[in-house]
Structures are given as structure tokens and as C-alpha cells.
Amino acid sequence: MKILVMILTASVVVRIEAVAQPIHPIPFASTGNTIELTIANTSSIPLSAVKVEAKNAPAWIRFVSSEHLLQQVEAKGEAQALFNFSVDKSSPVNQKHTLVFSISSPSGDHWTKEISISILPPTTFHLDQNYPNPFNPTTTISYELPAASHIVLKIYNVLGQEVATLVNTDRPAGYHQEIWSAVNQASGFYIYELLSTDASGNRFVARKAILLVK
């Protein structure tokens, strides 16, 4: 899903005024997002080799290219730098994050612009298949929460007997991972069950099979 996050105008000869910036919502675990930066040359001479660069982005934001070189910005003209990016599901949600862009020219002029974003929570509850599967002796169970919830994650054998409680606690909205160590368990199939209850009392239950091979 392609999203235009914002259009930013930065003057290369006029001081950038400090103004309040909106917080731009970005869909959870999304791809094809775009930040478009418009560089305006308000001088009477062309500017060449203007570098625009995303600086110190968090690891969960992946830019296709974090740097663009504008060969020339005409006098009284504009040029655009497009930054395409994806958001990893490990990103924290419902929090403000600041992306910093650096604009520099060969003459030594330098400007920065900050853009505020917030990653939206998942739209639905989801329980992933464990990985690896089959496994020995540990495996990872991942799930997504659209809202802060109380989580109970249990493991059962094929007879329906509980063999482990991995989680019984509150978790915020977003993506989470839990580890099951089955060192003391016998080979065979097991069932893991996720029970989630949010503040409004909405409940979600999901179960998946898991295979331990020793």
C-alpha cells in the first residue's frame, strides 16, 4: 500500500522556521510508503549537487535508498527527493518517532528537517505459526495485538493436558514474540493457545499445532 506521508518545502537560502509539525500515521507493517521532500531554491543562481539524506533512522524503518543527490535545482525553482520505505512489524506502535533529513550543498550550506510519524497498531488479532517448526529444543511464537490486552499463552499435549504457561500478563498493542523451550518434553505434536482480552472485554482465542522432534 503506497502512502504519501507528506510534502516538505525546505529553502536552501532562507532559514527554515521552527513550526509545529503534524504527526503522520503510518500503517502497521506496511510497504510502499513515500516521503516526498521538495527543495526550493529561492536564490537567483542554480544550485548543483544538493544532497538529501535520511539520518539515524530506526532499524525497523527500511529505506530503499537513504540518500538522494539532486543534480541541479534551478534558480527560483524546485526539485523533489522521494524516499520510499517499509515498516517492519517489530516497530513500536502508538508512539511518536522523529525522522531527521539532512540537506547539504557543496558550498557547505546545511539544513535539517524533522518529520514526526506514528506507527498505527495492527488492525486485527493474529497468531503466527511458530518458527522453526518442526523444532528442537526451542521455538518462537509470534502474535499481533490491535489493542493493549491481557495475554495468556499456553502449551497443551495431544491429550489436552497443559504442559506449560508461557505468558500470563499484560501486553501493549503491537507485535510480540515468546520463546518456548521444550527441553524437558517428549517428541510429538503439541497445541499452543493464545487467549487475549482487551480493556473493553473483547476476547480473542487462537490455536495452532506445533511439532517437537528430538
Language-model features: where?
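Short acidic, flexible loop segments centered on an aromatic residue
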Residues: 42-60, 100-103
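Short acidic/proline- and small/hydrophobic-mixed sequence motifs that coincide with surface turns
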Residues: 44-50, 135-139, 163
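Intrinsically disordered, low-complexity Pro/Gly/Ser/Thr-rich segments with frequent PxxP/GP/PP motifs
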Residues: 63-90
